[in-house]
């Protein structure tokens, strides 16, 4: 699950706990890769150390990766399969640990 986010994005911050919980709950079945659009490296580091334990995360202050996916509003997530194909796009915050989403991931 490729997630584009930023510390200055309130909906992104709201979504983070469910991303962390999804990774914890699904284990190796799902890998959450969170790409921050933050320009401020200190804010990014402080936030990720405090709130994003267990997630793979990088900072892309030039927005190159999100531009490759056509993403200009955050949060936005892409479910990418093992072959690198985008299976689904999610625009806006998602409650990743809702019963519907857990069922969706379990059926993959």
Where are the regions that the model predicts?
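Solvent-exposed loop/turn segments at secondary-structure junctions
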Residues: 6-10, 38-42, 63-65, 94
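Conserved SAM-binding loop
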Residues: 1, 11, 58
